[in-house]
């Protein structure tokens, strides 16, 4: 047991955190009625004894009105007693983007934890802009793509997704371009990371 971080057992209990995160992610009772966290998985833990514990959670969230569900990743850091509020206040001064689900920044005082909703991140300040660019393939000029495959090709479709995310450390996105050369009825896929 870490006397500086007595909340460790709770923040590593996915069922307890599913309920705690549900209350913290959605501000209003109507939003909590509309969205349910169906599953909470821990995808990463980094622990510094007597100092802090970083935990990343993957949530499966369902909109009960539409039946649609989606994934939201939260990366949080638990602090010794009394240290989460100053960290939350400091993080609140940064420009944050609205995530797909819930609030961009969450403070859970009952477990002395501050969480950032992906694509917001405590250390990677440019991640929101970078992940938006990866998902919005219109930011990659077709001429750039075509310069790499030669003349006569056309971009017919693009798909992007985040392939790997390690909170406070790295994020890798993949973009695939579907290409066609109509003169030879040839297709090709170009993938970049």
Placement of each model-derived feature along the sequence:
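Phosphate/pyrophosphate-binding loops and the adjoining catalytic core of nucleotide-dependent enzymes
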Residues: 1-193
């Amino acid at each position: 047991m870490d006397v500086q971080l007595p909340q460790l057992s709770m923040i590593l209990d996915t069922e307890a955190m599913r309920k705690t995160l549900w209350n913290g992610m959605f501000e209003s009772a109507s939003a909590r009625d509309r969205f349910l966290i169906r599953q909470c998985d821990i995808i990463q833990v980094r622990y510094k004894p007597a100092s802090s514990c970083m935990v990343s959670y993957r949530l499966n969230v369902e909109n009960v009105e539409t039946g649609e569900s989606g994934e939201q990743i939260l990366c949080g850091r638990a602090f010794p007693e009394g240290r989460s509020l100053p960290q939350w206040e400091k993080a609140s001064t940064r420009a944050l983007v609205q995530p797909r689900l819930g609030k961009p920044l969450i403070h859970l005082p009952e477990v002395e934890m501050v969480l950032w909703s992906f694509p917001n991140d405590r250390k990677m300040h440019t991640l929101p802009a970078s992940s938006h660019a990866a998902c919005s393939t219109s930011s990659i000029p077709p001429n750039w793509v075509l310069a790499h495959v030669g003349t006569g090709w056309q971009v017919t479709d693009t798909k992007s997704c985040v392939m790997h995310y390690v909170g406070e450390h790295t994020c890798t996105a993949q973009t695939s371009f579907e290409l066609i050369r109509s003169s030879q009825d040839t297709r090709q896929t170009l993938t970049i990371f």
